[in-house]
């Protein structure tokens, strides 16, 4: 990360969620990264939240993401919705070639191509990752 100006990166705590159908970020989070139309927003996709209500997909924020111990940024597209915190969908991560291992004290995501392990911490009954994001000059995820 030292080759990239620190001011361009923003730190986030992302909850690793095996029940999330998409990787999402709150509307108010990372406002400096523009929202772009996504396949889901074009289709009028809505998400059902814990209280049974539905919220619309508003598009996506295309980001470069660094994680603890990583040496190269990864591309990720966060879907934007009126959620309370950033969520990383385990299903979407698996679709991108990551294996998720969770245990009593934490775990990791393992990239099937590079074998890189991204650490996951356990906070109470939640699993979280510390990440740094900035706007991606590219398209969506790899």
Where are these regions (language model features)?
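Short, intrinsically disordered/low-complexity patches at protein termini
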Residues: 39, 48-49, 112, 142
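C-terminal reverse transcriptase regions that engage the nucleic-acid substrate
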Residues: 44-59
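Basic, gly/Ser/Thr/Pro-rich low-complexity segments located predominantly at protein N termini
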Residues: 24-25, 57, 64, 94
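Intrinsically disordered, low-complexity regions of eukaryotic proteins
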Residues: 24, 48-50, 113, 137
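Short solvent-exposed loop/turn micro-motifs enriched in small/polar/acidic residues
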Residues: 7-9, 40, 56-58, 71, ...
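Aspartic protease core domain of the pepsin/retropepsin superfamily
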Residues: 63-142
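Aspartyl protease active-site motif detector
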Residues: 2-47, 77-89
């Amino acid at each position: 990360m030292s080759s990239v100006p620190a001011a361009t990166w923003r730190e986030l705590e992302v909850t690793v969620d095996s029940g999330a159908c998409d990787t999402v970020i709150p509307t108010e989070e990372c406002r400096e990264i523009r929202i772009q139309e996504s396949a889901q927003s074009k289709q009028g996709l809505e998400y059902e939240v814990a209280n049974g209500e539905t919220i619309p997909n508003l598009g996506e924020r295309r980001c470069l993401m660094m994680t603890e111990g990583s040496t190269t940024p990864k591309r990720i597209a966060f879907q934007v919705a009126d959620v309370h915190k950033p969520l990383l969908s385990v299903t979407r991560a698996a679709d991108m070639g990551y294996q998720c291992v969770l245990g009593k004290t934490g775990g990791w995501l393992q990239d099937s191509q590079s074998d890189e392990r991204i650490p996951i911490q356990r906070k109470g009954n939640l699993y979280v990752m510390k990440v740094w994001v900035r706007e991606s000059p590219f398209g969506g995820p790899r």
